[in-house]
Each structure stands twice: as structure tokens, then as C-alpha cells.
């Protein structure tokens, strides 16, 4: 969005009841777009933060078993994350994965994204030696771009960003062309060259699904020795032993 208009965005993990108000307070008056991360690790935290932000477009990127120890189930996590729509402005848009249950949502406009061809913003990806090739389809029009990041989940994140741009009425061709400059934050699937070896650094955080994505990304690399160094996954509560297995 930086090339489309003046923008302000949350830094780091400023996504809680301290970070969101601080990010809002720091937003320059001339900003046309504001991007705010809203997070939670307990029930009832998303809606109040969304009410503060009052977004025109709200994005639910995924529903994973992170914090399942506190919320108890994936369904509880889904409901909590979808509460981000509570703060949407009139005629606002909820952007969400195509394969996420949405039959109980009838109070906002929904825009879906995903690898399913029935999604409003659908994508096909192809693995190359050192990049991912992505083709996105919106309103029967195709857009293509390359990503120098590794992992299906990171490709899906880029598709979600394009869906948000579409929901905002932004220049899609420009947004797609800017995807080639996308780099993952440190520890989020970065490709590193160390002593002639390729290292995939996905060390920022871990939950069962993100761990599976990381291992899948490793398995898709070119033939040769593959070594996975895995840490523990936290905040899984009573499900910890089962999910680690």
C-alpha cells in the first residue's frame, strides 16, 4: 500500500489493548490508509479493539490452534476472531478465507480469498527454485506475480492482502506489481544462505498448523538433505501433548 497512498501501520506486535490505541494515536493526519493488527489470547478481546479502530475493511487471515489453551477449541477461536467485524463501519467488508465457516455471519458483506476457484479472490501457486509464482483471479481477470518467500501459508497471506486492496477499491494491478518487493518479517519463512546451504527461518512463533506449513515448505525444496530443527509450541494447554505428537 505504500506506493498507492500515504499509509500508517502497526509496528512489531502492537496488537493488544495497549498497542492498538498507541498505534492509532501515532497515525499521521495525512495518512490515507491505516493498517492495524488486532490480536488476542483470551475471549472477548477482539471486539473492543475493533471498536477502537473502526475499520472499513477487516481481515481474518486464518484460524489456527494458537492460544487454544486459553480459548478451549478452534470454534471458540473462530468466533473470537470473527468478532473483528463488530467494529466495521457501515458498508464495511469482512475479508476471510474461503474455507472458513461463515454460515452464521449475515450482518456484514463478506469477501473470500483462497486457493479454491470459487473464492472471490482465488489463487494458484507454482514452486520455482528460489521463488513462488502466483496467479490471482478477480472478477474473471488474472494477475501474476513472483514471491521470494517460501511456503503456501505465506503465499496465501499475499492473496489476502490483494483481497483487502480489492475491497478498498485500490488499484489491483499496482498492488500486484508491488508484491514482487514483499519480504517476510524476520523469522517468518525467510530464505537465508549460510555457508552454501539454504536455511528457512520460520522461528518467530509456532502452533501446530504453522509448524506443518513450515515442514511442508521444507519438503518442497530441491532434492538433497533436509534437516528440520523444531522448538516447542506454547499456549496449547491440555492439548499440548497430543498436538506435539
Predicted features and spans:
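Short, charged/polar "capping" segments at the starts of alpha-helices
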Residues: 100-105, 120, 235-238
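Nucleotide phosphate-binding/pyrophosphate-handling subdomain across enzymes
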Residues: 48, 140-245
Amino acid at each position: 500500500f505504500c506506493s498507492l497512498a500515504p499509509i500508517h501501520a502497526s509496528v512489531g506486535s502492537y496488537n493488544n489493548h495497549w498497542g492498538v490505541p498507541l498505534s492509532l494515536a501515532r497515525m499521521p493526519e495525512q495518512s490515507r490508509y491505516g493498517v492495524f493488527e488486532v490480536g488476542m489470547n483470551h475471549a472477548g478481546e477482539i471486539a473492543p479493539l475493533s471498536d477502537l479502530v473502526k475499520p472499513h475493511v477487516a481481515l481474518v487471515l486464518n484460524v489456527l490452534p494458537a492460544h487454544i489453551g486459553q480459548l478451549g477449541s478452534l470454534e471458540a477461536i473462530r468466533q473470537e476472531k470473527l468478532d473483528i467485524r463488530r467494529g466495521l463501519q457501515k458498508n464495511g467488508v469482512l475479508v476471510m478465507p474461503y474455507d472458513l465457516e461463515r454460515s452464521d455471519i449475515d450482518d456484514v458483506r463478506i469477501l473470500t480469498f483462497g486457493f479454491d476457484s470459487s473464492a472471490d479472490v482465488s489463487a494458484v501457486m507454482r514452486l520455482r527454485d528460489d521463488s513462488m509464482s502466483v496467479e490471482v483471479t478477480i472478477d474473471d481477470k488474472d494477475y501474476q506475480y513472483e514471491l521470494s518467500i517460501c511456503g503456501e501459508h505465506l503465499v496465501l497471506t499475499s492473496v489476502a492482502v490483494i483481497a483487502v486492496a480489492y475491497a478498498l477499491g485500490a488499484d489491483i494491478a499496482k498492488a500486484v506489481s508491488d508484491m514482487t518487493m514483499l519480504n517476510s518479517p524476520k523469522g517468518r519463512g525467510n530464505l537465508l544462505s549460510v555457508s552454501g546451504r539454504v536455511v528457512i527461518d520460520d522461528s518467530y512463533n509456532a502452533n501446530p498448523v504453522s509448524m506443518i506449513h513450515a515442514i511442508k515448505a521444507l519438503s518442497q525444496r530441491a532434492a538433497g538433505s533436509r534437516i528440520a530443527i523444531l522448538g516447542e509450541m506454547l499456549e496449547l494447554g491440555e492439548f499440548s501433548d497430543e498436538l506435539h505428537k
